[in-house]
Amino acid sequence: MNELPGSYKLKIKKAATGSIQFSRYLLTRMTHDRVNVNAGYLAYITLLSIVPMLTVLLSILSSFSVFADVGLVIQNFVITNFVPASGDAVHGALLEFVANTGKMTAVGSVFLFIAALMLISNIDKNLNYIWRVTEKRRAVLSFSMYWMVLTLGPILIGASIAATSYVTSLNLLQNEVVSSAFNTVIRKLPLITSFFAFFGLYLLVPNKKIHFSHAAAGSLVAALLFELSKKGFAAYITQFPSYQLIYGALAAIPILFVWVYLCWLIVLVGAEVTAALGEQEQWSDSQEMVHSSDKDKITEQGNNSDSTDPESK
């Protein structure tokens, strides 16, 4: 067997060394940023805000006659593809909560909208902390961005679902080749949707310029972790259903709690990957870093941005 040329060996060695240094730097960075703690914090905020968010989304969709039935389609799609196993129980609980909000007064509806804005605001603060962003957006700009997410987001989602339904109804799909390709895309749709959702989050939320390649890499990691966690979590709660023996009819609640926590952990891990890729000078081979200097540099960065730590507010 022919040996690899020296130049290829050098490239392979350099790539392996770079991967090890990057992984070490990433783990140190994640430990310093306490991604597990922040994931729990965001999960708590999400659980308080999930019903207001769903209510606002469905209310906006229902105000457009063309999207009259899209809200139900979106709910079914999300539960089927993004909530592992026991989706029916979680779906039923959420629908019951949302239905109860219909009995609220105008003042209560305003507070629901504020709760939804708070969730988006906390996501913004946590992600900007990961990127060590110290310069805050102006209040007017932040509010405009949050308002756009709450209003245009549901409309764009509804338009996407409506367009998919229209394409599905076309005679073009009767062609075997086209139909097979379309079905393949549909099967991969959860992964594709996750990737672009993470990509938009990592590219647009931080108040600094993010390279497309870095955001794409972090999004790919997060999307793959999300798909793996869905399968792993589903296997666990179906093969080891001890939670049902303990919680009985309330089993859907801890399932939702744990799943939301895992989701945010994955979001933050993907964000850390994206941010770390943009700090190549901190972990590249040319710096000949050692583990202790990793900690020192990350700690120094963190201290410079402690004022933006979402938990300190």
From Swiss-Prot:
It is found in: Cell inner membrane. Its main location: membrane. The chain crosses the membrane at residues 41-61, 104-124, 139-159, 185-205, 217-237, 249-269. Residues 281-313 are annotated as: Disordered. It is a multi-pass membrane protein. Pfam families: Virul_fac_BrkB (PF03631). This is UPF0761 membrane protein VS_0126. It comes from Vibrio atlanticus (strain LGP32) (Vibrio splendidus (strain Mel32)).
